[in-house]
Amino acid sequence: MQPRAHATAAVLTAALVLATGCASGSSTSSPSATSASSHSSSESSTTPNSQAPSNSGTSSIPAPKPVTGKPATITIGASGDLIAHASTVAQARAAAGGQGYAFAPFFAALKPTVEAPTISICQMENPLSRTNTDLSVEYSFNAPREFATATRSMGFDGCSTANNHTWDRGQQGMEETREVLAANDLKASGPGTKAGEKGQPVFYEANGLKVAQLSYSYSLINAVGDQWSVPKEAPWLKDAMWFTRTSKGVVKDAAAARAQGADLVLVSMHWGYEYEGVNAQQKQVTAELMRSGQVDWIIGNHPHVVQPCDKVNGRYVTYSLGNFFSGQIAAIKPGTADGAFAAVTFERDAAGKWKQSMTFQPTYQNQTTRHVELASPTSNADSYRKTVRTMGLMGCDAKPAS
């Protein structure tokens, strides 16, 4: 199917966004849509009562001018959600013999896949503790510092930190997350940790190209039915909430990144309904961002299941790459063991024209060992078939890597 542009949807009368956390997968029933929840395998969905924001005016910012005479190629990889649920923290502790936390074995099979792109980016959906204290419990997360060490050791270069669990340990947790990532040579894109501090964009430089990443979430405080609120002491968080920032603001941020020299701009979006398909608001926001010419790839996460990819105006949208690593139980929430590691190759010719192509590696998380495994036609074949089918539902031309 030829790439296509979506028509911009009218402003929705209700925001089609899921405002829950990510539960780990206990056998208890899922919380009601009006109760606070978090990343466990039994999460609830809710529709906020507030109206969706107006996002008009994205076309008022001129599209970037092509850079001529400088052919270049770069491949960028992106994962689904990484979540250190309490159950996986306990398993990592046991694997380390009670001394520290051994997360690296969970990821070992995917190391060559993550290392292959020029740059690889993760979705870090939990704070990180510098002192390994106050760690993850149900509905509220905090990972040991070794989680970042393992993430870096498998080949990731940086992570998005904008998600509904960003504030799970408050401002101190945000500060420690940035410190732990930096200590492990991982860049971070997401909200700043204090007023006046710009948490993004973050820049990567390779192959003569400068790549910017911006990250936004529907909520940073795991609010149910509320995409507008932030803690009184942290008003700056609204700059990383796409519902308050609006598409116009995101496009403005992307244009500012280009003004700082970015050749490519990636936008990570924590959005959508958990365990469901692409919704109307995701399509609306996609249209508004992609028609601007400022955004080169939208990397979506949060639903914890793989959603289709699309190509809009020649640029990729991966609506949700599923889970890369979590403690969620697929027997309770089907599809949460499946993921896709996407790799997009960007090629610029001498005339300054860009071309994109994508491959994706289906992944499967073993439900007993919690190890992340490759999925292929001969290994974890059911998961492979589901992921390949889902990725192609919107006519995306991406190809499975195995």
Label each PLM-derived region with a short phrase.
Residues 2, 49-402:
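Acidic, metal/ion-coordinating pockets
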Residues 18-21:
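C-terminal motif of bacterial Sec signal peptides marking the signal peptidase cleavage site
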Residues 23-58:
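Short, low-complexity, disordered segments immediately C-terminal to signal peptides
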